[in-house]
Amino acid sequence: MNIRPLHDRVIVKRSEVESKSAGGIVLTGSAAEQSTRGEVLAVGNGRILENGSVQPLDVKVGDMVIFNEGYGVKKEKIDGEEVLILSESDLMAVVS
């Protein structure tokens, strides 16, 4: 995948979630939750501040993150893979 996000944008590949209930029933459709965790695939150069300087991002390629899937999150298919394009501010935590 050859993609370079701009500014404070981050490309994330959503992690797979277990699609079975605690009782072993396979969940489909709206019953199956989508994960809000994923792996960072690419990061932009950073946020441009009012004084023109660039503030580097806190996340790096390979980080596992928890994100808020809100209004500003864009879903795209790149090389047949669904990825999310979001601002660093939509990330809530880095999982170690």
From Swiss-Prot:
One of its GO terms (cellular component) is cytoplasm. SUPFAM superfamilies: GroES-like. GO terms for biological process: chaperone cofactor-dependent protein refolding. Gene3D superfamilies: GroES chaperonin. Pfam families: Cpn10. The keyword Chaperone applies. Keywords: Chaperone, Cytoplasm. GO terms for molecular function: ATP binding; metal ion binding; protein folding chaperone; protein-folding chaperone binding; unfolded protein binding. It comes from the Bacteria. It is found in: Cytoplasm. Together with the chaperonin GroEL, plays an essential role in assisting protein folding. The GroEL-GroES system forms a nano-cage that allows encapsulation of the non-native substrate proteins and provides a physical environment optimized to promote and accelerate protein folding. GroES binds to the apical surface of the GroEL ring, thereby capping the opening of the GroEL channel. Heptamer of 7 subunits arranged in a ring. Interacts with the chaperonin GroEL. NCBIfam families: PRK00364.1-1, PRK00364.1-2, PRK00364.2-2. PANTHER family: 10 KDA HEAT SHOCK PROTEIN, CO-CHAPERONIN GROES. Belongs to the GroES chaperonin family. This is Co-chaperonin GroES. The lineage of its organism: Bacteria, Pseudomonadati, Pseudomonadota, Gammaproteobacteria, Alteromonadales. The gene is groES.
